[in-house]
Amino acid sequence: FAMLLSACGGVKYELKDGVLYGDGKEASGTFEFKSGKNKVKGNFVNGLPDGVFEKYYSDGSIMLKDAYVGGKNVAEELYYKNGQLMGAFSETEALRLFYENGNIVMSVNLQTGETVVYHENGVPLMAILGNSAVIFNENNEMLFRIDNGQPVDLGATLNQLEDGSYELVKDNKVLAKIDANGQIGTYLYSTGEPLMSFNSSNNLSEILFKDGTVLFKSDGTNFTLNYKDGKPLYEAKGENWKFFSNDGEEIISNFDNITDIKKLD
């Protein structure tokens, strides 16, 4: 597509298939423009983005930094309005997401596909890689493990209760509760609150904060990661990702609806 950006000093700029042109020629220099309602500043070399592009919240604080090499996006950092790092990824490093207090909440290895979700205290909560997965409580005690689709015996005992449901018990402590059909279950924090629920009949799973607010929700294909107040931080639907600030503003990293171009040098 071609998008008219602006006429600055008599020069007409347009972005076509990722290349910036000025009066039909590949443009070079530092430019400032709007992407949607957000201001962006960065450098183009022979029409291609090159170097670090900064995108700003409406209050002027940095929303994200995108690193480009010859038009290729090689790394990205997202920020909260207070300057705290929200997330980062690159071609060689995993995607990492953080809460506003700096604690890591999730990492995704973009090469292997391994996904790790963390407890509030920074201890791994769940790690998934292919058909293998492991779940820990907040004390780093393993509650569940499956390797290549096969459950691993952790020394726990499955006890059936009078109503037909089950409790998974280890060292006189209940690790999980499972319904009579074995399809719906809940793993527990060390203090007894629901930690993770699953429903094998529809692939729905949820991870909960201790107060019951949903941290993570997935149907096996799509998933949502939330802030502590239940508002979305990160959504993945198929191959589409979305990030949100803690006040609900969507953070968009691509250059859409470009307007108000200004050449700075």
Question: Which residues make up each language-model segment?
Answer:
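Glycine/tyrosine- and acidic-biased, solvent-exposed loop/turn segments at the edges of beta-strands
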Residues: S6-D265
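Bacterial N-terminal signal peptides
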Residues: F1-L4
